[in-house]
């Protein structure tokens, strides 16, 4: 019998779009901000994952069209079939290494499980300046559309960047 995460369990009971957010730092802030923007935009959105009420509870009690999920590496490790339409990877730095036999590459792989089941119709938004993310993407293939963001440089193709204190997109 496979051991799955609560996220993997709950997704079986909803057809909602999910936005999954992970990273070593800034998950909660990014998740709350994303939820707030979607809610203020008039969308029927729920907030769950590693924040607030569990995703399973939300799915059982509410019928949201979209769920914004904060996802820890622990939750991502229990993913088998779950995928989100939009994955956001803030950054990766050495954290929880005791769980990964003190092997940073195992932790990085855990964070990239957020892309595991994505297709060409999905999106990965990621920090284009994060060395661990850049190295992993150079050596691995994902199916999702890659959308980098940067506070320093303008992405070559599609993405977001900071210029003259304004966030812009290409």
Please identify what each model-predicted range represents.
Residues 2-144:
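Phosphate-binding loop of NTP-binding sites
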Residues 101-108, 143-170:
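Adenine nucleotide phosphate-binding catalytic loops in nucleotide-utilizing enzymes
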